[in-house]
Amino acid sequence: MKTRPKTRIKTRVKICGIRSPKDIEFAALYGADAVGFITEVPVESPRKLDSDTAAALISKVPKCLDSVMVIMPETSTSALELIEKVKPNIVQIHSDLPLSELKAVREKADIPIIKTLSVPAEQEAPKLHNIVTRLLEEVRELEESGIVDSVLLDSGIAGKTGGTGCVHDWDLSRRIAEETELPLILAGGLKPENVQEAIRSVSPYAVDTASGVETQGKKDSVKVRKFIEEVRCTYAFL
């Protein structure tokens, strides 16, 4: 296991699934670091946007926030077309795009790339070792490639690779965080009530939430504020 000096850091916050100017306003007002826009994804999601809507919203994001476009492209060409149209600060790739295609995105778009990896939730203990081994291999390959800027670990369940609202085994995420120099973003079922425990357990570079700050399917300003307050009151050590 890699060992590094323990450094006190401030965990960054990404509010994902933004759908309106009000959502952006809440995130900026309460001190988020980034906002995510789920764009043209080929799966059912109450938070997905068409590219025109995503572009219009991203144009309203203040400079104090990073705009992250979350996409599930099958090719680098489709990813690059969306990046060109929507113009985010950062792109989050939430698909099994091969390294060669990721490299093409990096070289032609020249913006930071977050690569999402799915961590199966509700796994039996005997299977956890195999899951950790597989994820570590993926993370090491990404790190050695130098193509991506960070990895995001999200919970997968019942064929869904993210947006489940489910928490996965944070010990898995912690073990991955300890083995890589890539910044690790933790997602999956995070909400005001559990985000401090998540940070203490994993020491992530950032935390990501969507449904955890919603009420009846819409961003709740009280929950957004509470989530960010809980994060700011917790320091992780890396």
UniProtKB/Swiss-Prot annotation:
Recorded superkingdom: Archaea
GO molecular function: phosphoribosylanthranilate isomerase activity
UniProt entry tagged with the keyword Isomerase: yes
Keywords, comma-separated and alphabetical: Amino-acid biosynthesis, Aromatic amino acid biosynthesis, Isomerase, Tryptophan biosynthesis
InterPro entries referenced in this protein's UniProt entry, alphabetically: Aldolase_TIM, PRAI_dom, RibuloseP-bd_barrel, TrpF_fam
Pathway the protein acts in: Amino-acid biosynthesis; L-tryptophan biosynthesis; L-tryptophan from chorismate: step 3/5
GO BP terms, alphabetized: L-tryptophan biosynthetic process
Catalytic activity: N-(5-phospho-beta-D-ribosyl)anthranilate = 1-(2-carboxyphenylamino)-1-deoxy-D-ribulose 5-phosphate
EC number: 5.3.1.24
Family note: Belongs to the TrpF family.
PANTHER family: N-(5'-PHOSPHORIBOSYL)ANTHRANILATE ISOMERASE
HAMAP family associated with the record: PRAI (MF_00135)
Protein name: N-(5'-phosphoribosyl)anthranilate isomerase
